[in-house]
Amino acid sequence: MKESWIRNKNILFLSRVHVKKGINFLIEATANLKTELQGYTINIAGEGEESYINELKQLASKLDVENLIHFIGGVYGDKKWELFKKADLFVLPTHSENFGIVVAEALACGTPVITTQGTPWQELESYHCGWWTEIGTEATTKALKEFLQCTETQLEQMGKNGRKLIEEKYSSQKVAQDMVELYKKVCL
């Protein structure tokens, strides 16, 4: 969990670098908000096919945002957790995820999230800890714009709300309790 909340001007994508992850939407949204995002770093963390990573780098260059977008490769262990904690925002603009464990990891660290309706994370809205958007550049741009208008105090509260969501719905104790209830229903 973040120890303090100071805007670091750091946005994070952390997952496999693959076409289904919608990274192009994040790059295009960055281009749409190029002026507003000056001074920010958008870190793209993850491994993928070199040809696709190069395609994304070319897109960033073509849209003149290569100075904002940084491809940092795969990160694991303590380095991964540090990236989550230092990020002001985590973005997973994916086409489809069964769960999206990285969303849970970001929320557990107190980092607000933008993700799409291709994930089962509609609770981001009800817990006020992020944005659950339609899939695409326009929706990603809109959510990023709303993020940029948030104060540090608002973002800190969103981070706390996200941590609360994880503790209430996804802690090991809660999952175990839910499994016991499921077994009772099935077996009795």
Give short role names for the model-derived ranges.
Residues 154-169, 178-181:
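A short, well-ordered alpha-helix in the C-terminal region of glycosyltransferases
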Residues 81, 99, 104-108, 121-123:
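Short alpha-helical segment that forms part of, or immediately flanks, the ligand-binding pocket
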Residues 112-116:
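Short hydrophobic beta-strand element within catalytic cores of glycosyltransferases
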Residues 74-75, 82-87:
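Short alpha-helical donor nucleotide-sugar binding micro-motif in glycosyltransferases
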Residues 95:
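Aromatic "clamp/platform" in nucleotide-sugar-dependent glycosyltransferases that forms part
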Residues 54-75:
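Nucleotide-activated donor-binding/catalytic signature segment of Leloir-type glycosyltransferases, i.e.
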Residues 9-32, 42, 51-55:
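A conserved mid-protein helix/loop that constitutes part of the nucleotide-sugar donor-binding site
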